[in-house]
Amino acid sequence: MNELDSLVDAARRMFADAATPTDLENAKAQFLGKAGRVTELLKGLAQLPVEEKKSRGAAVNVAKQAIEQALNERRQALADAELQAQLQAEALDVTLPGRQRGQGGLHPVSLTLERIEGIFGSMGFDVADGPEIESDWFNFTALNTPEDHPARSMHDTFYVEGGTASAPLLLRTHTSPMQIRHAVQHVKKHRALLDAGQPMPEIRVIAPGRTYRVDSDATHSPMFHQCEGLWIGENVSFKDLKVVFTAFCRTFFESDDLVLRFRPSFFPFTEPSAEIDIQFQDGPLAGRWLEVAGSGQVHPNVVRNMGLDPEKYIGFAFGMGPDRLTMLRYGVNDLRLFFDGDIRFLSQFQ
């Protein structure tokens, strides 16, 4: 075996011993690098006589090609081994049972509605339900809303087919109609007591659900949720409203130092009326007054439309937006995110 054959054999053995691509590149440098043994042989050709240079150069090139071939074969072998190891690591056992699709979770607004119902349920409030397509009487007239009130216009309300000119049908603009329906049924149930001059059990109810208005922007949607509350009895005062709603807000936001403010306002169905603001004492919203609800003492005309004597029965009502409460609770700035159906966004609340 001559010198060049020994060189090729040494390169093959060293390449075969290389366990990683890095080891192989280090071995390559010893033979084909700038200071490698083959490179040195090629540089030495310049010192040979012309007659010998041609034959010697051809022999060195043959050895170089053999070394490069051995190098490429080892590279491919290492790549194949790496791929095989990766495939084995990622191999699927087809005898295993299939993976079940992950279960979904409740929508963040649904979580808020459940929380609201739970808190008021602990205070003795019932939960009312009712139709989303409502009559003009339950949605407006029974709630002391004047015929010329702007809320009755098509610019604010979605009217639907099926009604008459004197009794149109519409998508309810608030959940107050459910309160009226609940109160009317409650009064019918206890009519015998009322006729006998006996006290009727108090009406305590909340009415959560979807409502509809002609509106759409970052903080409003044509479909939104609302939850209204009603407490009617013989000795229910504005003080009770403050106690109940303060307890609710502090429980909902888990903040015992939450501050509430009642600002004078106007609603057709309550008198006096007040907007309710809250103020957090810490966190990113600390120090700001944030409107969360409207409220007031139920107007005598509304009490009368329930079938009760407003001289004897009195109470309070409030209305809040669960969507708004959800935004405040989770720090979301755009209401439309809740209804775009983006799983990436909604999955954060599961």
UniProtKB/Swiss-Prot annotation:
UniProt enzyme class: ligase
PROSITE patterns in UniProt: AA_TRNA_LIGASE_II
Any Pfam family: Phe_tRNA-synt_N
Keyword Magnesium appears in the UniProt entry: yes
UniProt: Mg(2+) binding residues: 271
Cofactor annotation: Mg(2+)
One Gene Ontology CC term in the entry: cytoplasm
Any one of the GO BP annotations: phenylalanyl-tRNA aminoacylation
Catalytic activity: tRNA(Phe) + L-phenylalanine + ATP = L-phenylalanyl-tRNA(Phe) + AMP + diphosphate + H(+)
Subcellular location: Cytoplasm
Cited SUPFAM superfamilies: Class II aaRS and biotin synthetases (SSF55681), tRNA-binding arm (SSF46589)
GO molecular function, one term: ATP binding
Enzyme nomenclature, EC number: 6.1.1.20
Family stated for the protein in its record: Belongs to the class-II aminoacyl-tRNA synthetase family. Phe-tRNA synthetase alpha subunit type 1 subfamily.
HAMAP family according to UniProt: Phe_tRNA_synth_alpha1
Record protein name field: Phenylalanine--tRNA ligase alpha subunit
Organism name: Paracidovorax citrulli (strain AAC00-1)
